Swiss-Prot record:
<dbReference type="GO" id="GO:0005543">
    <property type="term" value="F:phospholipid binding"/>
</dbReference>
<dbReference type="Pfam" id="PF00068">
    <property type="entry name" value="Phospholip_A2_1"/>
</dbReference>
<dbReference type="GO" id="GO:0016042">
    <property type="term" value="P:lipid catabolic process"/>
</dbReference>
<feature type="disulfide bond">
    <location>
        <begin position="87"/>
        <end position="111"/>
    </location>
</feature>
<dbReference type="InterPro" id="IPR033112">
    <property type="entry name" value="PLipase_A2_Asp_AS"/>
</dbReference>
<feature type="signal peptide">
    <location>
        <begin position="1"/>
        <end position="21"/>
    </location>
</feature>
<feature type="binding site">
    <location>
        <position position="76"/>
    </location>
    <ligand>
        <name>Ca(2+)</name>
    </ligand>
</feature>
<keyword id="KW-0442">Lipid degradation</keyword>
<dbReference type="InterPro" id="IPR033113">
    <property type="entry name" value="PLipase_A2_His_AS"/>
</dbReference>
<dbReference type="InterPro" id="IPR036444">
    <property type="entry name" value="PLipase_A2_dom_sf"/>
</dbReference>
<feature type="propeptide">
    <location>
        <begin position="22"/>
        <end position="27"/>
    </location>
</feature>
<dbReference type="GO" id="GO:0006644">
    <property type="term" value="P:phospholipid metabolic process"/>
</dbReference>
<feature type="disulfide bond">
    <location>
        <begin position="78"/>
        <end position="118"/>
    </location>
</feature>
<feature type="disulfide bond">
    <location>
        <begin position="71"/>
        <end position="125"/>
    </location>
</feature>
<comment type="similarity">
    <text>Belongs to the phospholipase A2 family. Group I subfamily. D49 sub-subfamily.</text>
</comment>
<keyword id="KW-0443">Lipid metabolism</keyword>
<feature type="disulfide bond">
    <location>
        <begin position="38"/>
        <end position="98"/>
    </location>
</feature>
Amino acid sequence: MYPAHLLLLLAVCVSLLGASAIPPLPLNLIQFTYLIECANKGRRTSFNYADYGCYCGIGGSGTPVDKLDRCCKTHDECYAQAEKKGCYPKLTMYNYYCGGGGPYCNSKTECQRFVCDCDVRAADCFARYPYNNKNYNINTSNRCK
């Protein structure tokens, strides 16, 4: 075996071992990221919404801090409805387009359409309401009751 092939094989093995310790990102969240950036025309990335208010990000409780946080609560509720329909919203891949008027769905199955609609409505909602930097990375144990 050539030394270059051995190096390549070693690099692949090391990267696979390292990747096994990293939790997988739910597949559809990658698509949701693109929908958010499409809807707000690149003004904010999805990372701005990953730890905003009481509902944007992992989990959620209490009263939303503003209209933008309410968008996240509504998105969580939409995903809960998708699960009741037997869908797996965080794993469901769907077809969508980013046009001049923002994102829209073009999926075939009921679950794909439902989950995509949840994500498009949330992305449009994020674009509609102002972002308050004071509501990013808040102390949820104090403010989300």
